[in-house]
């Protein structure tokens, strides 16, 4: 399991401005070249803000859970917990097999109750006590740039499609029908900066400092 803490800013820009930024970034050697991937997130809540990647629309302090898949690779699913507290975002994530995801969809949660990784135990409580269920499937056509320092990211969402209508058989399918949420010729840009916190904060929260630069490139 890995943990991250960071700050982020989001905005919607015209596609022409996006192209100008991309041209500039490609000229800057401090940025790694970036490909475009499709990131599917199965969120376990229905009321999400597409601009801020599932942070709740109406609440400043909130948590969200999702299962993430990149480029239709079902062999490398990720369970992700994203929390926002007074502007600071923390994210925990771990590997999830397709079989484990199917067990969750079937309502088989007990195996998570005594799991070694805390994110599974937290998710188990949310599923059993708060009755969280898969609520919306969102696909992001995403391009992520990471600076060489590994502490700053610039992420562009060229398309954001979603649906509330899915089944166990279609939830990971690339053929799942969805509705575009971005206006035409608009791009969502997100700037992320990893948080540098005092050592005692990591000790209090249990987050390991050595994992602070392991944010998945398209998360």
Residues covered by each model-derived region:
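Phosphate-end processing signature that detects enzymes handling 5′-triphosphorylated RNA
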Residues: 1-219
């Amino acid at each position: 399991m890995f943990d991250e803490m960071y700050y982020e800013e989001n905005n919607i820009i015209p596609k022409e401005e996006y192209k100008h930024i991309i041209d500039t970034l490609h000229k800057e050697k401090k940025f790694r070249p970036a490909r475009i991937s499709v990131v599917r997130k199965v969120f376990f809540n229905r009321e999400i803000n597409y601009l801020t990647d599932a942070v709740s629309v109406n609440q400043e302090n909130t948590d969200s859970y999702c299962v993430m898949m990149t480029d239709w690779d079902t062999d490398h699913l990720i369970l992700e917990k994203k929390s926002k507290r007074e502007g600071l975002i923390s994210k925990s994530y771990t590997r999830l097999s397709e079989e484990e995801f199917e067990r969750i969809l079937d309502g088989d949660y007990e195996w998570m109750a005594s799991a070694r990784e805390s994110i599974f135990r937290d998710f188990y409580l949310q599923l059993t006590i708060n009755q969280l269920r898969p609520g919306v499937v969102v696909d992001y056509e995403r391009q992520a740039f990471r600076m060489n320092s590994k502490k700053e990211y610039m992420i562009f969402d060229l398309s954001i499609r979603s649906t509330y209508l899915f089944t166990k058989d279609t939830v990971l399918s690339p053929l799942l029908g969805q509705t575009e949420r971005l206006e035409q010729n608009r791009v969502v840009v997100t700037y992320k900066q990893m948080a540098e916190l005092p050592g005692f904060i990591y000790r209090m929260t249990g987050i390991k400092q050595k994992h602070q630069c392991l944010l998945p490139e398209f998360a």
